Amino acid sequence: MAIRNFSGQRMNPGERTKALLQGQTVDRVGLFLFARGFCARNTGVSLMEFYTDPKANLEAQIWTAQMYGNDERLKFGFASSIAWDFGGEIKMPITEFDQTPMVVQYPVQSEEDGWKLEIPHVKEAGMVPLNMAFCRLQEKEGLVKTISIGAPFMNAANVCGLEKLLKWMYKKPDLAHHLLRLVTDYGIGLARYWMETFGPESIEFRTSTPTSSNQVISPKHFKEFSLPYLKELHEKVLAMGVGYFYTHICGDQNLNLPYYRDVPFGDPGIASFGHEVDLTKAIEFLGDKCIIVGNVEPRLILMGSPDEVYEASKECIEKGKKAERGFMLGPGCELPPTSPAGNVWAMRKAIDDFG
């Protein structure tokens, strides 16, 4: 089931995003819903099924994209999946209060575990077979294949736990760098597997940097422990022939923004930002390199009124339309699964009225 034109729109989501990436004029500001669990709840699919059944997952995302006119390229998975890939234990969402899969046991429990850790066989690791099945379904539907290869600092945190990684940065920096080396090489291998399977056309690779926010680490530690590995990952994957990266720069990363200038994203890439970063500042640092996405506060979408979401979306659009390489409106992080439909629609209405 392909994503058709939203009623009254000249372009469909695939055409609109492709035009942005090619530097062409689009008919309206794009909508980047950043929606996972919301798609499940929106279509009556359980979160357990959504995160374990690629077909049900894709259908839920397509129906939701059709409903709201979502221009985001659809993706399978969840933020901490690399813990599963490296042999950790994941708990799938099974109760009404669960929002997403979570790690219940990290692969690395001790320093000894860290030094003994090995890169898993990429084709068989954890969630990879499910992700590959999802991308094969995307291929059948004529959609761009998407795969999140994380970002090394986030992936290392999901291998040993963020608290341990932060402690080892100070007390055992060699061990921290060892884990970062392993997950970087794993991400490159995962990208190579996708490229060998599908070729460089119609693939979107994704990275995300929530654990690199200044709410977690300083700019000094970002420069030492996060930036070099993220830069290497992007450089080596782009050298394989893929066109661009989509990167979510999550949380308060205002002090890190100058360093992101050194990261290649493609020409252009796509970069989304947490609500803690003003879009004007995001455009200042990356607007010449990336299509900018953002950044309505997720809390507001979950707990605010439609009028409040509408006004916040209007403010984002007015700032974002000044981006040199283009702009898409979206939440500042994943759309909360229990967001009221009226609040999500308010974002789309703001695009219709101001974008």
Name what the model sees in each region.
Residues 1-41, 45-50, 71-75, 94-96, ...:
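Active-site loop segments of alpha/beta catalytic cores
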Residues 42-83:
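Segments that shape or occlude catalytic/ligand-binding pockets
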Residues 53-55, 106-112, 125, 305:
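Intrinsic-disorder/low-complexity, polar/charged segments
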Residues 79-120:
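A contiguous, low-structure linker/loop signature
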